[in-house]
Amino acid sequence: MARYFEDYKIGDRFTTPGRTVSEGALAIIEGLGGYCAPFMIDEEFAKATPLGGRIAPGRAVAFLMGGLVEMSDIFDLETVIALMGLNNIRFRSPLRAGDTIRVEMEITDMRETKNPERGLLIHKEICKNQRGEVVAEVEGTHLIKRKTRG
């Protein structure tokens, strides 16, 4: 069943399924993205840094968070028009190969648009690892179809 703008309310909370991030997935993301910082690709180098080992690029974390949200049933692909933006992204803890992450989302605001067929959903996403540590936080805005017309 399609979920429209009116089907959400401020304060709604959702949690995505978890995903274990493999070494292979990180290697593909790093390769495609052109990431080459030694602390991301050289384990021995990274062990000697305050990080204590290799970590995933922050932008890879945001990419994986988007995938988890996409795979969940938080948004209906029939009614989402576009992701309009991501704001105030913060990386709190490193993501490492073998970590399992999930995203907790809360609808924080809803705004009508000039177009009566669309509305904006503003939400906060928090990515946590298997230990409950916050890996990243971001505020997002999605443009969603409305049930009501004019």
Predicted segment positions?
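Short beta-strand or tight-loop elements
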Residues: 84-87, 103
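Short, mixed-charge aromatic SLiMs
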Residues: 86-95
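Beta-hairpin (beta-strand-turn-beta-strand) motif
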Residues: 67, 89, 106-108
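Hot-dog-fold acyl-thioester-processing enzymes
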Residues: 1-84, 149-150
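HotDog/MaoC-like acyl-thioester-processing domains
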Residues: 3-10, 94-150
